[in-house]
Amino acid sequence: MERNKASRPQEVLDLVHERQHGPIDRRSFLHGAGRFAVGGLTAGAVFQTMRPNSVSAQPAAKETHAASARVLERLRTRFTFQISVDVATLEQGRAVAAAALAGGVTIVEMGTPLLKNQGVSNVVPAFRTQFPEALLLADMKTMDGGGFEARAVYAGGGNIIDFLALAGADTAKAICAVRDEFRRAGAELPRLVFADIMVPHQGPAAQAIEVAHRMLEAGVDAVGVHLQSDARRADSKLIESDYLGDMARAIFERIGKAAPVQVVGGLSIAQAKSLARAGMRAFVISGNLGQPDTRARYDLPPAEIQRYVAGFIAEVSSAQQSQ
């Protein structure tokens, strides 16, 4: 049974519709509806009386934020490419990022070496100033103090913080709480949280899938399947085999309809094309620039970096999904 909406003034009905569908925030709704609060019925209660009178509780949904939702939908359904700017200096980092953007990347990742060498409070504002329209991700590899680190990224103009899923649900929730705070403060900038699942450490596949589910339950927006750089340098079989691809497919098959799944860690063009045919859409270009080895190529001239990046994007985007 639903409460009688006809007993409410039309102005209240209009306010409720606007609140439910996004044009006004909670504060504006309460201010407007407060004019109609009578008999001890608060504006908040007015809003509650407009909801269906159902006893079946629904799980709490994430707060909607249109700018963030658009990015997530793109990551899930369209080809997106991220460059990991894993260098030590701001000068080189800016040059690599500019070349990659010219090559067509969707997201610029301020890599962990750059953030640790130069400092978050220096790198993030510098990249935002130079690349005002770019989606900026900070690969913080956070293991604790998640709220503090997320605040530094968002305050500097970053769009996405990437932390280690190994940190657990409490850190994930702390980061997501700060994300939500910044979303409420501004509608224009996307604010997202990605969790990196480090493999082989967090393998095998069954364990990695469980971790992915826990991260989504904690509120993160997307997960990355990240082949650890030390591991792939120590064991060449991780590169020669399709270990990363197998892990990524397993996770994508289980959560890919619910959230974007990125593939990270020395990804080659051939691997990325195979994953694209399996339906995956979010890829990270590492220092090897899509070549089937572990050699970093960020010391190449910018025009060469741009050529490698553009080639990676063109090759992978042309892969047809298997039916």
Give names to the regions the model predicted:
Residues 26-38, 42:
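N-terminal export leaders
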Residues 290-322:
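C-terminal helical cap(s) of enzyme catalytic domains, especially alpha/beta-barrels
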Residues 23-24, 44-78:
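C-terminal segment of N-terminal export signals and the immediately downstream linker at the start
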Residues 1-28, 50-52:
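N-terminal secretory signal peptides
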Residues 79-85, 108-110, 136-140, 161-163, ...:
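Hydrophobic faces of well-ordered beta-strands that scaffold small-molecule active sites
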Residues 156-239:
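Conserved anion-binding
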Residues 145-153, 205-215, 267-282:
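Catalytic cores of alpha/beta
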